[in-house]
Amino acid sequence: MSYYSTSVAKLIEELSKLPGIGPKTAQRLAFFIINMPLDEVRSLSQAIIEAKEKLRYCKICFNITDKEVCDICSDENRDHSTICVVSHPMDVVAMEKVKEYKGVYHVLHGVISPIEGVGPEDIRIKELLERVRDGSVKEVILATNPDIEGEATAMYIAKLLKPFGVKVTRIAHGIPVGGDLEYTDVVTLSKALEGRREV
């Protein structure tokens, strides 16, 4: 016997598919949404649909954008000879909050993780190599998370970049091992970027 009507159960089920949302939080969110005015619910659902329909990946760096080329890649004031490699689009947001990095980015959309069945061909490493191959890149900063998968991915990319003769650096470890860039405070992230080391 279900405690909820079919509609409520379906809403809870869908909300619990979101990352970090367990059954209890999904239930709380569902009842919050149910109690919202209908126009606010429509506005929320429209914002979700619009984001899904309009957003895409930048054709250069693979960050999320609503244009063919994102604002960072199209900004002529940025240093296009320095590429900061991150795992996810949220890492770009974290790095931009520091307000010290003036280069461009490359978003891998994951890390190498044999346990999860993710190999180098499943993330955007090939596209990074193509960007470096054109010869205008002087430095690649590897800013993947300092966990096992992030370290393995950084070392793998560093090895692939050696033949290109570019400077390859790794952000310093003011960031705790196993930590996520997304949740790192601005000062720590700033110091980690400042203290990056050559790989």
Swiss-Prot record:
Pfam short name (any one): RecR_C
Keywords: DNA damage, DNA recombination, DNA repair, Metal-binding, Zinc, Zinc-finger
Recorded GO MF terms: DNA binding; zinc ion binding
Annotated Toprim domain residues: 81-176
PROSITE patterns: RECR, TOPRIM
Disulphide connectivity of cysteines: none
Domain of life of the source: Bacteria
Zinc finger residue extent: C4-type: 58-73
InterPro entries, per the entry: DNA_Rcmb_RecR, Hlx-hairpin-Hlx_DNA-bd_motif, Rcmb_RecR, Rcmb_RecR_Znf, TOPRIM_dom, TOPRIM_RecR
BP-aspect Gene Ontology terms: DNA recombination; DNA repair
Family listed: Belongs to the RecR family.
Function: May play a role in DNA repair. It seems to be involved in an RecBC-independent recombinational process of DNA repair. It may act with RecF and RecO.
Stated name of the protein: Recombination protein RecR
UniProt source species: Caldanaerobacter subterraneus subsp. tengcongensis (strain DSM 15242 / JCM 11007 / NBRC 100824 / MB4) (Thermoanaerobacter tengcongensis)
UniProt lineage: Bacteria, Bacillati, Bacillota, Clostridia, Thermoanaerobacterales
